[in-house]
Amino acid sequence: MNKEIKSIRGMYDYFPKDLKIWNYIEIIFKEVLNSYCYLEIRLPILEKTEIFKRAIGNVTDVVEKEMYSFNDRKGNNLTLRPEGTVGCVRAIIQNNLLQKSNKFWYLGPMFRYERPQKGRYRQFYQLGAEVFGLDTEDIDLEIIILTNRLWKRIGIDSFITLEVNSIGSKIDRVQYKKELVNFLKKREYLLDEDCKRRLYTNPLRILDSKNQDIQNLLKEAPLLSEYISFSENNHFKNLCNMMNHHGIKYKCNPHLVRGLDYYNSTVFEWKSNKLGAQNTICAGGRYDSLVQEMGGRKTPAIGFAIGIERLVLLVKSLKIFSEVIEESNVYIIFIGDNNKCHAINLSEEIRDLYPKLRIFINFLHQNLTKKIKNAISSLARIIILIGDNEIKKGFFLVKDLKEKKEYHLLKKELILKIQEIFK
């Protein structure tokens, strides 16, 4: 007995019903990013494992537990990218891209070995955007305004909230980590197993624990904001003042940290309470040391990533986008194989004149009644019938399914009717 063929756990197929929403969202992404002068780049899904370890941090969950890594035939250790920023930074260093531009965006699959659940998959798609060379809070603000504009264009701005924080510099966090660890060690018996592990590897990640008991415990913990420098604190205050001025609603979350070691200063997340546990739609922040740490010159930077699957889940749950799929605009039915060539020729002539129309020819061996039923179920606007009688008399029988009318039209008249209907 043959084993049933299945996809890999946590990796999913996507079909036209969902991809209609995906494509709609991607069009909005591209239009908005273009309006802010971002340029698209396309990056490999495989990178050398070492660059992720150096950039993300050896004691992060991503590197310790979640990366898909393997040796190729020459013994090179490679990893399916778990996120996009590191590959983008590698590309701009390797190709000297900062000589030409400083704003880039990319879209594609990422891979993490996590426990699959709604909104969290082992292969998932992200849109990422990165800005290099600017260290003031002005670009932090522009990034946040840009993402806010995306939500407005998609129609979800009323169902998504912004959380912001400053995690200071790496130097600021050294002293804070000591104080946080001292606080938590005295209460280690109250920690869950995951937090006990993080206490000795990456204690800052305890701050964003989803365990409510841990969050209650952290109410008494020292605050990171009390340990960041004057300049970092001033940067964050200026950003908050600017967001207030521009009408951006936000919440300061002192426990917001990012799971990747390269972040510093401003961090932010856009969340929705409509998605359950995996409620972060978009996350980002500054990473002013990463370019230099990866071998480039010192270059401040900031970026964000949007989880496409979670965004699609939100759009679907809010029912703000029609899931109806229009399979065709024009549905051509030929009667008799001798008229197949006429159907093909007509379809190509229409495509030449109206390249945006969706034209379907029914090549199935079905009776006329069945073919017409298929045309109706495909949500076609018009049916064009081509039979011996039509060819002999030089006209086409056209059925307008929306207006429930029939026409007998010469080819020139047919072309004009199509222009009239689909103008």
UniProtKB/Swiss-Prot annotation:
UniProt EC number: 6.1.1.21
Keyword line: Aminoacyl-tRNA synthetase, ATP-binding, Cytoplasm, Ligase, Nucleotide-binding, Protein biosynthesis
InterPro entries registered for this protein in UniProt: aa-tRNA-synth_II, aa-tRNA-synth_II/BPL/LPL, Anticodon-bd, Anticodon-bd_dom_sf, His-tRNA-ligase, HisRS-like_core, HisRS/HisZ
Reaction(s) catalysed by this chain's protein: tRNA(His) + L-histidine + ATP = L-histidyl-tRNA(His) + AMP + diphosphate + H(+)
Superkingdom per UniProt: Bacteria
Main location: cytoplasm
PANTHER family, per database record: HISTIDINE--TRNA LIGASE, MITOCHONDRIAL-RELATED, HISTIDYL-TRNA SYNTHETASE
Name this protein carries in UniProt: Histidine--tRNA ligase
